Amino acid sequence: MYQRAIEDWLDALPLRRQVVAYVRAQGVRAYLVGGTVRDALLGRQSYDLDLAIEGQAMALARQVADKLYAAYVPLDAGRDVARVVVRVQGGPYHFDFARLRAEDIEADLWARDYTINAMAVSLQDPLRELLDPTGGQRDLAAGVLRAVREDAFREDPLRILRGVRLRGVLGFTLTPETEALARAWLHALTQVSLERIRDELVQVLALRGAASSLAYAGSLGVLAELLPELGGQGTPLMERAVRAVASLEELFGPWASSDETLTKMQNASSLGLLQRYRPALARHWAEELSSGHTRWVVLKLAALLGALPETLTTEGQVARRLRCSGREIRFVDAAIAASRRLLAWGARGELGPVAIYRYFRDLDDAGVDGALLSLAVHRAQMEKDETSETWAALVGHTGQLLNAWFDQQAILIDPPQLLSGHDLLQILEVKPGPEVGQLLQALREAQVQGLVNTPSEALEYLRKRIRGQASGTLPDTGAQGQHKR
């Protein structure tokens, strides 16, 4: 039975079959292992292929990469592990090659994390023998995650967080014995490199319904170990952080995917007014910020960290500690700052053009994400109450900001340059210094209000402003006025 499942899984993606055929033709002893065998037996399609090699794995990976005109990525030279990345439509495909972790394949399987990941199929056999020394098939059928050995977490504590992720991916449960082992070795997570923790945490955040996995991680004690700033299990801060992620996913999860089904809550609430931006937001959130981490996934991190005291997040200390990239740190900071700005605005009336301009001047494209994050945070804090005046104002402000970003950038966010700093120095005889930038900023704010539309109008406006500065009066900026165009 499993032979057919393996064959069907390989045939589902011709490129996968091509790689297996090439490896088999080289005459090396190689095995399909780990998640590959697990997913094949479950009938779960993925773009990954895991191969264990008796011999030089990195050299073989290089040959496959050359044959496929693909990227070759060395992962661990000390353990002889490399990845081949093929970027095609629907991809990318990841083909991982690793030298056996022990003297033979059975010992290699006993050195793995969970029994459902400790099965292998020999490519030389051809696909006739399923190697399952730890009882992975039994646990796969039962839907449980069981540690291969009692010292599995001592050997690599990150396997605890991986168990949280696999639980979310597969809908399995950890056995009571495995949960007890995990709790016993939580303290050892501090020994794991922060880069590895970050990568595993991002994979948890990438799950649909990540909040459920985060809540479980909190109950297990993992979240407090990784983010001690959130406090221990059941603390208000941790619960608020997880609720914010849950609210974000409930409100916008379908918008960030290809799923065309909206929840009843979305159809019934005033959030429906924002649905016209759904396709644009789907593209926006699919953008990769760094190392395969999409904007949507990093926004979930911002939702999680946004519950922390402001002093911890304004400088990105936590994201920096997790070894996030510079771009991700700036995004998290800006999205949280944007969310807090909207929440501080409260139930005020419509935003004027200058307020919108300054918002995006300060926050750039993360202002889009932060506006939507503010809705999730407010909804989480108000226990899903969408009838308040503040909620209606938040939706209205968010609609104005999305309209400005997606439909009126050249008018409200980045108006055309009418004068340069050189023009101010030469024509208006402004002295070099901070005043040049201040005047150009004032000019842009006048433009977004529709007060200035041509270079000649810009010169006249600045002349009046300079005279006003000299006399102690300034032209009215009309910051809350309506755009004239």
Give a label for each model feature:
Residues 1-485:
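Catalytic cores of the polymerase beta-like nucleotidyltransferase superfamily
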